[in-house]
């Protein structure tokens, strides 16, 4: 009772203190307008410099920041296409209003007590909304301000909030139902390296959400954009010059119901694993023979003893996920120049565990009307992922010029262990598969850029030079296969086969580009803008892999095992007459490749008054791809040298009925080129799908015609409703297919004949103040998409949806934000329709088809909250994936019996639950 009383008194004291503090605060208010036209600017951002406290202007350009502690502040006012103004000395007195009226201008000038900084801010919701509104290409975006309201920890999770986008494997994006290969990604102003060895994709989970200023997704082609996209062109801008000086620290802990405080298993770890750099300690020694098959068994046995023998499995209790970050923002004057720096370092480590059913099937048993397993397995998967990242960006503002030097680095290390057990019906054996794997990924992107304005902003020139590097290192993957007869006896599993595998990939990218803009004014109704630009990009890839197996001779050791192999692979058991490594590497396990892209464009933005705007232009791209490798037999060389030159016209038109209503129309031609890995014949084994993956040197480029129409309604500042439709027609679309290969399955890439996609998108952002809930806002975006792949006459193939395409997707959220008490919360929901993960192979008799594999629909619900305590501290928490719905992959086989009756058989391929994650964290900013 006494404890309850004390807590009640403490609560009442807190309420009293809060009321007292509010009574001792003041207000900053005023109006923001255009300096030339004297018209109010709707949605301008007004922020107290060095803090996150701010508002946007209303329909009359007015703003009001309440509960400001007495003192002197700098206030930053920004708006898209206007120069930011920082009012340095705004004095706030308790219970009084400090009035600040600001006129924003395009001109580079200096006003009394106002420092004009030529830096556009795009990190606020209003800034992104206005960028989308004023852009001629069809696009959507999200700001760092909106990201902060969610529990999203990386760029992949953030992208789910953008209309028309879904996520595959927690890191790859699907735009408008089109698979990740149809997207292009730039980090700031240059291309990103592919982070995967076996697909054309960028892994968005390497980008922490805290480093993102804004993300824009362009959905229609435009001359200044690269032509190699049909789904979306994604540009991620990292944080840059700040308004003031600040430091911030963040810590977050995450509890996962599958893993945290549960028994966990991994092979023995290295000290460098703690920072994600564990790959180096697992690589082959420098004195390794060039090929073991060229040496004697005695030499091979000696080498076998030399390489690491970390086969032991360590059992421990998994800790909750840990995330730490530090950020420093610096802004200062250097003479007449303004210098800014954003430095950030982040670290995270976490554990994941799931139990998965994993199946493959033979042809359907028509006699017994039943599915027949080929393999029926159950997996236990353990994974520890560590990420270390850094951002180091500099900006220099000097008169009419701006210079930026941006650097992004990420290191990711993943240690995993999979124990698979079940029945192999093909060989009629009980089997166990065991895989221990460590992967290291290194990503770096560096860019130096400049922007220069001339002749009172009539001419603008910008340029960028960039370098990117990606390393994927998979050292010492260990696979062990054990078996026993399925007779129900207690006979132990016996090791039948063991393998070790090493691979490393290095990508280097060099880029340079420039854009020029010239404004003309013919009369008051016609003010065209002429654009032109050049872009060059050169990429290289070096890939090398080595495969090893074990010769197991003699009987002087125990090959029986129960998920523990350290007793078998010991130095005592290794020798020329016992156990030693043999090499299975051939010439097809290595390849080199490079490509060059040279592009140029011209376009014109044409207008008729303020109502009609059009951007008309053409882009030309020269592309050269070279590859040197071998066919899977390691004998026949593969030497490719392919060049294409293509024109890509585009037209983007917008018509403004008034300041609230707008209609867009767009057409553009684009290309989808095969990536390095998709054309090289190298074969890689995917353990999760227990199948080989190989490329196809005969792949052709796919071309697409893209048409968009979208109506946009802007009810008030910060609100939007848009409804759009789109059509995409493809020639030679590239898809991943699979086919039977002996007793297993092999995946590869193929061109279909043609395909098309037709869809509708709806996006709504609405404040709920019209029903008296002024602190609540509602967000909804969804899409309905129909796609079909067509095949030539006489083909066994039957028309079906495009690979990776969802027939519908839904993202919706409810946001609460009260600036007076510093409390915010959100509820976010996501669902996708079923989509083809892998294309099957049809047969002449449909009953014998290898069906397509579908990822099934899944509901995802996230909750989050944050509470500010004073000016410096913020508490955050949330629940991720509250519903913990199964992630499921199914096949659907249409069967016709001899009597002509047809039924659809549902066959489970893979299924598991990822677990619910509860997060709580604290941030301190000063």
Identify what each model region corresponds to.
Residues 51-62:
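Short, acidic Ser/Thr/Gly-rich low-complexity loop/linker segments typical of extracellular
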Residues 831-843, 867-926:
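C-terminal beta-signal and adjacent terminal beta-strands/loops
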Residues 493, 505, 509-515, 694-700, ...:
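Outer membrane beta-barrel strand-and-loop segments of large Gram-negative receptors
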Residues 191, 420, 473-474, 563-582, ...:
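Surface-exposed extracellular loop regions of Gram-negative outer-membrane beta-barrel proteins
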Residues 33, 37, 44-47, 78-82, ...:
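Short, acidic, small-residue-rich periplasmic hinge/interaction motif at the N-terminus
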Residues 27, 303-418, 444-448, 651:
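Transmembrane beta-barrel wall of Gram-negative outer-membrane proteins
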Residues 726-729, 748-839:
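Gram-negative outer-membrane beta-barrel transporters
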Residues 91, 120-122, 126-174, 189-206, ...:
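Periplasmic N-terminal accessory/gating domains of Gram-negative outer-membrane beta-barrel systems
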